[in-house]
Amino acid sequence: MKLFDSHCHINDKSYDRDRKAVIENAKKADVHAMMVVAITEQSANKAIEIANEYSQCFASVGIHPHDVKTCSENVLSTLIEWSHHPKVKAWGETGLDFNRMFSPQKSQEKWFIRQLKIAEDLNLPIIFHERDSKGRFLEMIRSYDPNERKGVVHCFSGIKKELKGYLDLNYDIGITGILTMHKRGEYLRSLIDYIPIERIVIETDSPYLTPAPEKNKVRRNEPAFVRSTFLKLCDIREDDPEYLAAILWKNTIRLFEILEEEVTII
């Protein structure tokens, strides 16, 4: 069995002392590939460094909505240049986050549209971030949709209406450890049967959102723990683990246009 953590931040400084061990832990948990996701120019550079060093790691470049207050065309030009690296497989994460407004809404919307255009020009799938945008995110991607684009709505925790909107746009749905949480994950669990199996990918969003089975043991999430989310998904869907793992793997490499031979299974 092989699992793919479709969204992690092991480029975060909290892994600087034990990153190699974290990647070893992932392999022991059958997590044989991971997408290291950027949120800033600096984190994009680190993601590419990690992808260069570890064959099972891939990278994205992009600016998170929290960080667009410092975005500029110069920053995006640098990211565009880096996007041509062979291990860069996606643009993101980008989107809208109105939860705590670390960047003004006007700036978020401006740089979101700009990054959509860049990803389209580069023909890269998009890793979307949406939180508490009250319908504005869907409104924007529906109005700016020049072509069918590949993308994933990472860490989905929205309502059924939003889920339908994303599926109608042919986006994949990223499922995190929220699925395992007793109260917080209750509504998400109720929506799982509405997501076609070919549209699901799993993720940790580490170091955040530690799944329930690990939450009382460790503070920091890591790619190995995507296995807990996977097993909960198997339980909800009543799927055989080998069967579901194979489908989720295919979904993820299709999304990021990764060839099987690009992933070294050790």
For every predicted segment, state its role.
Residues M1-I266:
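Mid-domain alpha/beta scaffold segments of enzyme catalytic cores
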